[in-house]
Amino acid sequence: MDQYSALPSLLGRILLAAIFLLSGYHKLMDPQGTQEFMISMGMTTVTTLFYWGAVAIEIGGGLSLLFGFMTRTGALVLALFMIPTTLIFHSNFSDPNQMVHFLKNLAMIGGLMYVMTYGPGRLSVDGRSRRALLNESLMVAQEHRRRYGETGT
């Protein structure tokens, strides 16, 4: 990534994270209402397990995106979570509102795929870790050259 991509990458991660963090927070604040809605959409078995799984994935994945920590993994988990979620909750295409939500979710999955492919950018925990590892590797290589010369013997 070039020098101009750090800030847009950070802002993109924040915007993607926001919807997951807010959705997870709202689920956490209204467990009964959320589970009743899940049941009304046909999720009648192990609803509590699915509820807590959704809360964990949305908040955990949202934090992963926000801080850029284990970002590719967080984006992958969120994208995989969104596939069945989108098909279960937004597949009534005769309702224009549901079609909009379906397409919005597809766009979010696309954004998550972009994060999986190109990573979190420099302004992230992962980016700092990668730079620290690279700097350490460069210092080791420079010390090796200083001691042993270019031939390495």
Q: What is each of the regions a protein language model found here?
A:
Residues 1-29, 46-56, 60, 67-153:
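Extended, low-polarity transmembrane helix blocks
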